């Protein structure tokens, strides 16, 4: 077992690197030649809400800012200016926060949504580009959140051993279940060890479990992705999820030598990303201003 953990350790550490809610994520550089124009826009593009493209290559028109504080939620890093999303995403946050209050699941600590007009971010994310993605902490930090706080999210996984820590408990599992139960959700990304724990809890099985997917990082937050809004033809639907709850050999792969090797090959955000949709150039334009070229 210790031999297994020895070679698994590099994979687990690399798994932590792409997260958006820890110190490494906030400084993780993007690929060379990255289009920085999207991160320089301060306001949403006016117009009817449109999610354009796909999570890793797209933009959003008519985005709305999530209030930094509301009934049952708080945005933990407002200085990042990433509290914008499609109106459907804000509705989802309000509904989940309301359920969390009713079921005593605690305050929703909200990480990144997206930029005012979506698009690629210079640090931390490959996706979050079309206003339908949001990061949520598994729970509040050990110290109370205050203005200008640099509090870190509690981690659920010991990255040296790959085992769940004492911070993992029934409340966290119920929060993930509540988050995945919404019909608006396409999928939720969690650390592979968390997915395995949910699979092993036979009393918690249900259709929602299929939407919870293992992915690199996500030891200190989970990533919710919504379905394309109804009637939004510019939004590209992701590949359908495999049938079943995902508690089979596909989950075992994440603890394999092949997974470790794959993690080592992962590049920075933006590397190998699909081309941006042509419609996004008009989303980036300001009224009365000439088109700008990517640097």
Q: Which residues are covered by each model-predicted region?
A:
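Extended, low-complexity, intrinsically disordered C-terminal regulatory tails
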Residues: 34-46, 92-124, 189-211
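Extracellular "leader-to-stem" segments immediately downstream of a signal peptide or signal-anchor
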Residues: 11, 20-64, 283, 287, ...
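Bacterial N-terminal signal peptides
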Residues: 3-15
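Extracytoplasmic
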Residues: 103-105, 129-133, 219-221
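Sterically constrained small-residue positions within well-ordered secondary structures
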Residues: 7-10, 101, 125-127, 215
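Catalytic cores and adjacent binding grooves of peptidoglycan-active enzymes
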Residues: 21-34, 146-295
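Active-site acidic/histidine clusters and adjacent loop/turn architecture
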Residues: 39-111, 168-178, 182-185
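Acidic/His-rich structured neighborhood in mature extracellular/periplasmic domains
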Residues: 115-165, 224
